[in-house]
Amino acid sequence: DICTNCCAGTKGCNTTSANGAFICEGQSDPKKPKACPLNCDPHIAYA
């Protein structure tokens, strides 16, 4: 399992659940990372 959340995901990269449902797009710019909580969103299976 991966451990990520919408905030920590990379901008432009979508996260999906185990059945392929779209959850969110990442919000963190690799050049200017956001300060994100390190919690795992249990719904996110792929990023």
From Swiss-Prot:
GO biological process: defense response to fungus; defense response to Gram-positive bacterium; killing of cells of another organism
Disulfide bonds: C3-C40, C6-C24, C7-C36
Natural source organism: Solanum tuberosum
Record protein name field: Potamin-1
UniProt record similarity statement: Belongs to the protease inhibitor I20 (potato type II proteinase inhibitor) family.
Xref: InterPro entries: Prot_inh_I20 (IPR003465), Protease_inhibitor_I20 (IPR051391)
Lineage, opening ranks: Eukaryota, Viridiplantae, Streptophyta, Embryophyta, Tracheophyta
Segments crossing the lipid bilayer: none
Pfam families: Prot_inhib_II (PF02428)
